[in-house]
C-alpha cells in the first residue's frame, strides 16, 4: 500500500426529481431505496432553507424510479429537522412495502406528549400510528428505539424537534427517561436505559453538573446488539464542550460495554469564552469528537474518533478491551458520514465536511483492501447555511451496492442525487441513467 493514494473518478450523477419543490432524505445511516430498488424515500418541502417551527410541514413519500422518477406524497409530518428528516426508513422485516416515520400527534397521554410515529403500508395504503417517536428501527422490524426529541432540541438542536413557547426545563440525568424500546407490532414500550444509569456507568467527574443525552443509536444487522453515543455537557450552546462515549448494549439492556470515552479538559467553560467565535464545522473537526458510528457487521463498528491519543476512522471490535484498528491512516484524515456496502464490505462510502476556503465537500469511496480512495465528486455548499439548516451529503447505498444517493444544495436547491459507482466497485449490471445524467468531478 502506498502513502495517501487518492484517485479521482468521473461517475454518472443525476438529480432525482424536477420542478420548483425541494427534496431530501436526511441521515446517512440507512438506505432510502426499498428492497426491490424501485422506490426511493424522500421528504418534499417548498423551500431550501427555513428556521424550523412546530408547524412547518414536510411531505412524506417516495420517488418511483420505474415511473420517470415521479414523486408520490403519501403523508405529512411536522416532526422533522434538516439533518435527519423525520427518520424515514423502510421496514424490511414486514410483509410488502412498509415504512415508518415520525409525526406530531394529539395524544397528550403518551410518554412524550404530542409526538409519535406512523407506519405506512404502500400496498394497502393503510396507516398505523404508534405512541412514541422512533430514532431507529431494528433490521428485523420487530422493535424500534425511541428518545425524547424535545431533550435533543435543548442539548443538540440540530437533531431535535421544537415546541411552541420557550424550551422546557429538563432534568440533567433522570431515572425515568432515556432510551425506550418499542414493539412495532403492538406499540408497547418500556425504558431500556435511563440517563441516570448512563451517568452511573463508569462515571466521570465532568458528568456531575452536566445534562446528558444519547444520539447515533444504531442496531446491528442481526438486530441483537445496539450502539449509541452517550453525550453530556455543561454548555449546550457550544458543541465544542460536548463530551462523548461510545457504548454498546443488548436489546434487553444487559451486557453494556464502554468502547471509547473522549472525556477531556474544557477551557471553553471559562466565563470569558465566546461560543459565537466557534465556526459552523469546528465541532465536527474537533480532535476529541466521537461521531457517526455504524455497524460494519454484527460485531464491528466503524467510527470517527480518538483512540490512544490519535483521531482517525477506527474499526472497533464490540468488546471491552477488544481490537481497535485504524482505517485509512493517511487517506481518511477528517470526519465524515461512513457506511459499508451492503453487498461487499471491501467498500466504504463517505464524505467530508466543507473546506473552509472553498465550501466544497468531497464524496468518495475507500477500498479497504487496497487502501485507495476514489473521489467521486466535489459539491459546493452555501457557507451562509447554519448548523441547524445545513445540508450534509449524507451518502447512502442502494441495496445492490451499485449506487449512492446524496442530499446536496450545489444547484442552489436542496435536492437528491444518485451516483452510479458500479464501474468502481465491480459489481456489474450498470444501471441505465436518465437524460439529465452528467459526468462530473466538481459542482
Task: Give the positions of each predicted feature.
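Asp-box/WD-like beta-propeller blade repeats and closely related beta-sheet repeat scaffolds
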Residues: 79-93, 100-178, 191-209
Amino acid at each position: 500500500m502506498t502513502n495517501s493514494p487518492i484517485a479521482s473518478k468521473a461517475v454518472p450523477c443525476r438529480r432525482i426529481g424536477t420542478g420548483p419543490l425541494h427534496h431530501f432524505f436526511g441521515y446517512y445511516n440507512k438506505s432510502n431505496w426499498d428492497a426491490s430498488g424501485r422506490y426511493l424515500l424522500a421528504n418534499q418541502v417548498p423551500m431550501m432553507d427555513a428556521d424550523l417551527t412546530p408547524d412547518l410541514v414536510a411531505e412524506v413519500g417516495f420517488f418511483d424510479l420505474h415511473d420517470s422518477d415521479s414523486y408520490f406524497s403519501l403523508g405529512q409530518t411536522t416532526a422533522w429537522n434538516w439533518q435527519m428528516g423525520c427518520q424515514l426508513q423502510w421496514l424490511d422485516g414486514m410483509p410488502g412495502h412498509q415504512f415508518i416515520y415520525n409525526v406530531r400527534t394529539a395524544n397528550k397521554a403518551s410518554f412524550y406528549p404530542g409526538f409519535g410515529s406512523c407506519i405506512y403500508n404502500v400496498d394497502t395504503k393503510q396507516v398505523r400510528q404508534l405512541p412514541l417517536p422512533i430514532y431507529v428501527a431494528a433490521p428485523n422490524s420487530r422493535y424500534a428505539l425511541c428518545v425524547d426529541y424535545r431533550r435533543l432540541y435543548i442539548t443538540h438542536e440540530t437533531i431535535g424537534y421544537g415546541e411552541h413557547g420557550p424550551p422546557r426545563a429538563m432534568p440533567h440525568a433522570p431515572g425515568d427517561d432515556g432510551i425506550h424500546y418499542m414493539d412495532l407490532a403492538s406499540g408497547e414500550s418500556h425504558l431500556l436505559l435511563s440517563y441516570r444509569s448512563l451517568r452511573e456507568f463508569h462515571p466521570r467527574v465532568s458528568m456531575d453538573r452536566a445534562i446528558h443525552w444519547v444520539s447515533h443509536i444504531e442496531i446491528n444487522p442481526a438486530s441483537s446488539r445496539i450502539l449509541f453515543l452517550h453525550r453530556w455537557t455543561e454548555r449546550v450552546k457550544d458543541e465544542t464542550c460536548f463530551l462523548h462515549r461510545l457504548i454498546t448494549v443488548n436489546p434487553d439492556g444487559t451486557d453494556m460495554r464502554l468502547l471509547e470515552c473522549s472525556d477531556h479538559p474544557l477551557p471553553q467553560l471559562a466565563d470569558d469564552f465566546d461560543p459565537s467565535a466557534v465556526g459552523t464545522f469546528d465541532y465536527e473537526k474537533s480532535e476529541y469528537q466521537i461521531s457517526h458510528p455504524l455497524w460494519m457487521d454484527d460485531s464491528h463498528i466503524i467510527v470517527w474518533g480518538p483512540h490512544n491519543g490519535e483521531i482517525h476512522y477506527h474499526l472497533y471490535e464490540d468488546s471491552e478491551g477488544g481490537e481497535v484498528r485504524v482505517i485509512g491512516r493517511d487517506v481518511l484524515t477528517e470526519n465524515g458520514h461512513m457506511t459499508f456496502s451492503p453487498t461487499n464490505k471491501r467498500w466504504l462510502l463517505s464524505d467530508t465536511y466543507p473546506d473552509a476556503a472553498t465550501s466544497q465537500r468531497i464524496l468518495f469511496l475507500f477500498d479497504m483492501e487496497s487502501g485507495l480512495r476514489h473521489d467521486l465528486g466535489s459539491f459546493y455548499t452555501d457557507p451562509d447555511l447554519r448548523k441547524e439548516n445545513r445540508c450534509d451529503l449524507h451518502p447512502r447505498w442502494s441495496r445492490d451496492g451499485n449506487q449512492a444517493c446524496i442530499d446536496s444544495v450545489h444547484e442552489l436547491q436542496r435536492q437528491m442525487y444518485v451516483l452510479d459507482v458500479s464501474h468502481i466497485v465491480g459489481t456489474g449490471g450498470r444501471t441505465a441513467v436518465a437524460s439529465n445524467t452528467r459526468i462530473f468531478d466538481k459542482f
